[in-house]
Design a protein with these regions (language model features):
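Fungal secretory targeting signals
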Residues: 1-23
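N-terminal carbohydrate-binding/catalytic regions of secreted carbohydrate-active enzymes
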Residues: 26-110
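Hydrophobic faces of well-ordered beta-strands that scaffold small-molecule active sites
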Residues: 27-31, 61-65, 86-91, 120-124, ...
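Active-site beta-loop-alpha junctions enriched in small/polar residues
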Residues: 32-34, 66-68, 93-97, 124-129, ...
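Aromatic-rich peripheral "rim/lid" segments of glycoside hydrolase catalytic domains that contact
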Residues: 34, 238-246, 260-302
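Substrate-binding cleft of extracellular glycoside hydrolase catalytic domains
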Residues: 75-158
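Aromatic- and acid-rich polysaccharide-binding/catalytic face
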Residues: 84, 120, 126, 163-207, ...
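Aromatic-lined carbohydrate-recognition surfaces of secreted/lumenal glycan-active proteins
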Residues: 150-169, 218-230, 265-278
C-alpha cells in the first residue's frame, strides 16, 4: 500500500445481481501471506481465508496475492484456491534479479503442477514505479519476460503491473503501460488526507480512476484497467484530514465498493479482508473489513 499526498484510485468488478459476480470479471480482496501471528500461512490457513470470504455471500470469487515464492505463497494458496473455487491474481516481485528469478520459478512450478485455470491474471511488480525501485524500461522487459513464459502454457493469460494512480498517469512510465495487458491501479483517499465524507461527496476515488483509465487507453487501447487496492482503516493514527473509524470504513465501502462492483467491465480487489496485527505502522493493522479473527466489522452491503 502506498502513502502519497495526491488523488488516488480505485475501480473494480462486477454484478449481474446483488452478490452475483459477472462471468469474466473478478471481485475480491488483496491479501498478504502472513497469519495474524506473523507466521506464513499454510494451505489450511489459505483455505479457511477463501472459505470465509466466499461465505460472506457477496459473490467474491478472487484474491490478489503479492508474491509467488515468498512464504511459499503459490505452493500453499493454489491448492486451497482450487478447492474453494477462488481465482488468483498472482503477484511476481519485480525488483532484485535473484528475487525476480525465484518468483518466476515458483509461478512456473505452480503452472506445471496445477495448470492455469486457477489464474485470474499475473501482476509483475507492485508500486515499483511509485517507489522508483526499478526503471520503467526494465520493468517493461520483465513483463514481456513473464508473459513469454506463461503463454507457453496458456496463450490467453493476461500479464500486467500494479501501481499507484500517479504512476499510471505519468508519461515517463508509458513504456510499462504499452507492455501491459492489464494496468492495475491502487488508490487510497485516506492517504491523500481526505476525510471519508469529502472523499465520498467529491468522488475522489472515482475521478482518479477515470483519469487512469483515460491515460492508459490513450497509450494502449487494448489494456484493461483493474483495481488492486483501496480501503479505509478503522483504528490507528489520522493522516492529515483523514481519520480512521468503523463508520468511515462502512460509509466508504458502501460508496466505493458498491460503485466498483457494479461495473460490468472492471475487476477489482479491496484492501483488505482481515486485519493484520503484525503490520506496521499501527494504522496498517486495521484495514480489514473483518478483524484478525475473521469477524466482519459491519454487514457488507455488496
Amino acid at each position: 500500500m502506498m502513502l502519497f499526498n495526491s488523488v488516488v484510485t480505485l475501480a473494480a468488478a462486477m454484478l449481474l445481481l446483488p452478490g452475483q459476480a459477472m462471468a469474466g470479471t473478478y471481485k475480491g480482496f488483496s491479501m498478504g501471506a502472513n497469519r495474524a501471528d506473523g507466521a506464513c500461512k499454510t494451505q489450511a490457513d489459505w483455505k479457511t481465508d477463501f472459505q470465509t470470504i466466499k461465505g460472506w455471500g457477496k459473490g467474491f470469487n478472487a484474491v490478489r496475492l503479492y508474491a509467488a515464492s515468498d512464504c511459499n505463497t503459490l505452493a500453499n494458496a493454489v491448492p486451497a484456491a482450487k478447492a474453494t473455487g477462488i481465482k488468483l491474481l498472482v503477484g511476481v516481485w519485480a525488483t532484485n534479479d535473484a528475487h525476480f528469478g525465484a518468483e518466476k520459478a515458483a509461478l512456473l512450478k505452480a503452472i506445471k503442477a496445477h495448470g492455469t485455470a486457477w489464474i485470474a491474471a499475473i501482476s509483475v511488480g507492485s508500486e515499483d514505479l511509485y517507489r522508483k525501485d526499478i526503471t520503467p524500461q526494465k520493468l517493461a522487459t520483465e513483463i514481456y519476460d513473464v508473459r513469454g513464459m506463461v503463454r507457453q502454457y496458456n496463450k490467453n493469460l493476461k500479464v500486467g503491473h500494479t501501481d499507484t494512480w500517479t504512476a499510471w498517469v505519468d508519461g515517463a512510465n508509458d513504456v510499462v503501460t504499452k507492455a501491459c495487458d492489464i494496468a492495475i491501479t491502487n488508490g487510497f483517499p485516506y492517504w491523500q488526507g481526505v476525510n471519508s465524507k469529502t472523499a465520498i461527496q467529491k468522488k475522489t476515488f472515482q475521478n482518479s480512476f477515470w483519469s487512469v483509465q483515460k491515460h492508459v487507453k490513450a497509450v494502449n487501447s487494448k489494456a484493461a484497467v483493474w483495481v488492486g487496492e483501496t480501503g479505509w482503516p478503522t483504528a490507528g493514527a489520522s493522516f492529515q484530514g483523514a481519520a480512521p473509524g468503523t463508520t468511515s470504513l462502512k460509509n466508504y465501502y458502501g460508496s466505493v465498493a458498491c460503485w466498483l462492483w457494479a461495473k460490468p467491465d472492471t475487476s477489482g480487489f479491496w484492501f483488505t479482508a482481515f486485519d493484520a496485527p503484525t503490520a506496521s505502522p499501527e494504522v496498517e493493522k486495521h484495514f480489514g473489513v473483518a478483524d484478525s479473527k475473521r469477524k466482519l466489522k459491519f454487514a457488507l452491503p455488496c
